[in-house]
């Protein structure tokens, strides 16, 4: 059985070799590409006053002396000391 000839054979008969089909038809190639529409500008959010960061919305202000029991993880001991101290004040 004879071997097949490659498309780009050196001997190649141009009449027998089929040309590759065009990717786009002539009608589509004649039309210019449509211009892209300009992007719309984004709307700026309306300002309703001063906003805090998400993590600080519900927290009370921290005093500057550093006696914040929640931050120092002594909340249970500080609360128990305050409860004992109020009973002795009478």
Curated annotation (Swiss-Prot):
Swiss-Prot/TrEMBL keywords: Acetylation, ADP-ribosylation, DNA-binding, Nucleus, Phosphoprotein
The protein's name: High mobility group nucleosome-binding domain-containing protein 4
One annotated GO molecular function: chromatin binding
Chain segments carrying region Disordered: 1-90
GO biological process, one term: chromatin organization
UniProt modified residues of type N6-acetyllysine: 82
Biased segments, Basic and acidic residues type: 7-23, 37-64
Entry superkingdom: Eukaryota
Sequence positions bearing ADP-ribosylserine: 29
Organism: Bos taurus
Chief place of localization: nucleus
Record field: compositional bias (Polar residues): 65-83
Phylogenetic classification of the source organism: Eukaryota, Metazoa, Chordata, Craniata, Vertebrata
Record-listed Phosphoserine modification sites: 80
Subcellular localization, as worded in the UniProt entry: Nucleus
Gene from which this protein is expressed: HMGN4
PROSITE patterns given in the database record: HMG14_17 (PS00355)
Cross-referenced PANTHER family: HIGH MOBILITY GROUP NUCLEOSOME-BINDING DOMAIN-CONTAINING PROTEIN 4 (PTHR23087:SF31), NONHISTONE CHROMOSOMAL PROTEIN HMG (PTHR23087)
Cellular component terms per the entry's GO annotation: chromatin; nucleus
Family, similarity comment: Belongs to the HMGN family.
InterPro entries in the cross-refs: HMGN_fam
